[in-house]
């Protein structure tokens, strides 16, 4: 009976990466397309969906897997990616939390592995021409990038646990519109690294976004605000920011971080 969850229904000579949860909350829409191949599966009820993919980018042959089950609440989504790049070993060599000097050594020929298990309740509160929803969520993430633990005297892999709550309320869109005409949403998250001991603290993250009409009929304007605070007292490392960096910039390490951005 379990095999009925995996019925191949289509394939494509490309690898397409989609972020399902952000599409649900209207926070972000994006597709990443790479040379490769993808096989898609779905059961007859449409409650189980899967994907196996291969991609080639930047000189790396990569494997990808996705599986989601929505037959009951909560929804479960699992994803894993192998060999998108070489893995890294990160060591704190000098400085303090405000000016950390961390060395990231690339382990050539050692594939990077990342995996996550997300569970959430997509509560649909839509009515009267508005799409509304409340999404409590719990996410576990793993990567074989490693940091040096001075207490343990060895490198340890990364594990993150994030609990969060999202709310969105947007006016239903016409197909020709890039953004909803009116709407807003908010996202509150708490991120921690279990088993990290003296190395990592935790992060509180909040972001809000809103949509307003643009200067012309169809294009709209999206305004975004984000704030995060890392509780890092007595810890050796900072986690990468949950808040997005400005376009064209690499991820930052910050104790306090605030951003405001428009999109048109």
Regions found by a protein language model. Name each.
Residues 1-73, 77, 157-181:
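Outer-membrane beta-barrel initiation region
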Residues 36-43, 61-81, 111-123, 159-169, ...:
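Feature captures outer-membrane beta-barrel proteins of Gram-negative bacteria and organelles
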């Amino acid at each position: 009976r379990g095999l009925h969850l995996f019925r191949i229904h289509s394939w494509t000579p490309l690898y397409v990466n989609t972020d399902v949860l952000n599409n649900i909350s209207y926070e972000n829409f994006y597709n990443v397309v790479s040379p490769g191949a993808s096989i898609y599966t779905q059961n007859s009820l449409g409650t189980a969906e899967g994907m196996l993919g291969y991609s080639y980018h930047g000189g790396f042959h990569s494997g990808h897997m996705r599986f989601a089950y929505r037959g009951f609440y909560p929804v479960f989504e699992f994803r894993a990616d192998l060999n998108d790049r070489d893995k890294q070993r990160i060591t704190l060599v000098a400085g303090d939390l405000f000016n950390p000097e961390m060395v990231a050594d690339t382990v050539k020929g050692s594939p990077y592995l990342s995996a996550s298990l997300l569970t959430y309740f997509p509560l649909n509160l839509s009515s009267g021409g508005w799409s509304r929803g409340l999404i409590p969520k719990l996410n576990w993430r793993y990567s074989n990038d490693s940091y040096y633990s001075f207490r343990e005297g060895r490198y340890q892999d990364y594990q993150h646990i994030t609990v969060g709550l999202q709310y969105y309320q947007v006016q239903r869109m016409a197909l020709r519109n890039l953004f909803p005409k009116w709407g807003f949403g908010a996202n509150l998250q708490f991120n921690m690294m279990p088993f990290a001991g003296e190395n990592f603290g935790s992060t509180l993250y909040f972001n809000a976004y809103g949509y307003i009409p643009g200067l012309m009929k169809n294009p709209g304007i999206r305004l975004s605000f984000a704030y995060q605070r890392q509780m890092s007292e007595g810890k050796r490392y900072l986690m990468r920011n949950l808040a997005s960096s400005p376009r064209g910039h690499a991820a930052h390490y910050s104790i306090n971080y605030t951003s405001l951005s428009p999109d048109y």
